[in-house]
């Protein structure tokens, strides 16, 4: 069986990482080989991005270029080979984050999408987690003690508005204020209904 690409999106603090790892563990435990991964990566371009989030020395256009370069490498060297080997990829952030985050900084959203056309792998399912902005910021502060420059209330409100506008049939909007198990169960039920994976063993 060829693998699948399942994407988790949403603002920082919405719980994507925890849900992604939980989902990956459940799939592996029922015999569906799965890998959790994330963007930006810790490879060259992703590391440059992580540095810039603290130093504030890149323009939105420069940030976008690094995100796309990192994503190209991620797809080429990790995501595509794993999918071809039959793995389910559970991906924390993808091109939709670039559209939302850089779009909220004024870069045309269609332009951002078009920059991906030549290399992107279309996801099988996208789950967009929505959470009250103040709750998300409080979670971030509790977890690491600071917020980076992508993480202020007004900006994240604009980002979430763009996330809320995504309405392709394979995209599903999730209330991330619920407990993690409830969120994961909702995602698993949607995967089961979509029939992209054999989840009949799940009750």
Swiss-Prot record:
It catalyses: dTMP + ATP = dTDP + ADP. Keywords: ATP-binding, Kinase, Nucleotide biosynthesis, Nucleotide-binding, Transferase. Coiled coil: none annotated. ATP binds at residues 10-17. Its EC number is 2.7.4.9. GO terms for molecular function: ATP binding; dTMP kinase activity. PROSITE patterns: THYMIDYLATE_KINASE. GO terms for cellular component: cytoplasm. GO terms for biological process: dTDP biosynthetic process; dTTP biosynthetic process; dUDP biosynthetic process. Belongs to the thymidylate kinase family. Phosphorylation of dTMP to form dTDP in both de novo and salvage pathways of dTTP synthesis. NCBIfam families: DTMP_kinase (TIGR00041). This is Thymidylate kinase. It comes from Brachyspira hyodysenteriae (strain ATCC 49526 / WA1). The lineage of its organism: Bacteria, Pseudomonadati, Spirochaetota, Spirochaetia, Brachyspirales.
